[in-house]
Design a protein with these regions (language model features):
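RNA pseudouridine synthases
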Residues: 1-282
Length: 282
């Protein structure tokens, strides 16, 4: 939705005129989520004074790009998206164009889109990018200091004996790109909290929290616990009823590098998971 300002007016007043049933709290949330733009730039406050001729844009709650990427949030510092499965997060030696990072750069017409973390090609869900060097450094520091909270859901083979707990090991990748636990001297510390939220005789649905962010960490920890993620052939899964790896990045919480406000984004579980587990009850 777009409209042109015909006379000088406060942003809050013009929004109340167009959305009389929306509270001030709701309108403020639109500001914080990057839904309101003034002449193509993100509005910073409800109290800003608008001048005649300026253009105000109210964006939808999210934008779905042609490739199936759902843009949940976008401003001058960060982009938060929901990545579909079977899409590379960033460029590799074998693929540079058909990646989430490059598609965002092209589709959103961004000069810079910096990766601050990754999801495996087979994993769907929440992912975040930085739009400038300052934001990139801030977010990378938050990751390094374990200030960012990431929650995943995974369907795994078998039922866990222990309902909840913590997996901890040192991981190392070999020359064939296979990651496994190793000795303290040779590996990097990886810590995963797990909670079994549903199970039957064949499968279990786990809520997983990354306390560290090592390559293939969740896949390795589940597999080495005797419960490989459904569809994860690389780490010894025997079944693939969903025809995809059943790992989903569900939520992400971080401190906005400019606004200095804690933000949380959620990507609901894929409906395909419901073929095995009753995800609607979560």
């Amino acid at each position: 939705m777009k409209f042109i300002i015909v006379q000088n007016i406060c942003l809050q007043d013009i929004l109340k005129k167009h959305f009389p049933k929306s509270s001030k709290t709701t309108l403020r949330s639109w500001i914080h989520s990057g839904r309101i733009l003034i002449d193509g730039r993100y509005a910073a406050d409800l109290g800003v004074e608008l001048q005649q001729g300026q253009c105000v844009t109210i964006r939808d709650k999210f934008v779905i790009l042609a490739e199936g990427i759902k843009v949940l949030y976008e401003d001058d510092a960060v982009i938060v998206v929901e990545k579909p499965e079977e899409m590379l997060s960033v460029a590799t030696d074998f693929e540079t164009q058909n990646t989430l990072q490059n598609i965002l750069k092209v589709r959103l017409r961004r000069k810079n889109v910096f990766a601050v973390h990754r999801l495996d090609r087979e994993t769907s869900g929440i992912m975040m990018f930085a739009c400038n060097e300052s934001a990139k450094q801030s977010l990378k520091t938050q990751f390094e200091e374990r200030q960012i909270q990431k929650t995943y859901y995974a369907l795994v083979e078998g039922k866990l004996v222990t309902q909840q707990g913590c997996w901890q090991s040192y991981l190392k990748e070999d020359e064939k790109y296979f990651v496994r636990s190793t000795s303290v001297e040779n590996g990097k510390l990886a810590i995963t909290e797990f909670n079994q939220v549903w199970s039957n005789k064949q499968f279990a649905l786990l809520r997983l929290k990354l306390l560290t962010g090592k390559k293939n960490q969740l896949r390795v920890h589940c597999s080495e616990a005797g419960h490989p993620i459904v569809g994860d052939k690389k780490y010894r899964a025997n079944s693939n009823p969903l025809r995809r790896m059943a790992l989903h990045a569900y939520s992400l919480t971080f401190l906005h590098p400019v606004k200095q406000k804690k933000m949380t984004f959620v990507a609901p579980l894929p409906t395909s998971f419901d073929k095995i587990a009753p995800i609607k009850t979560l």
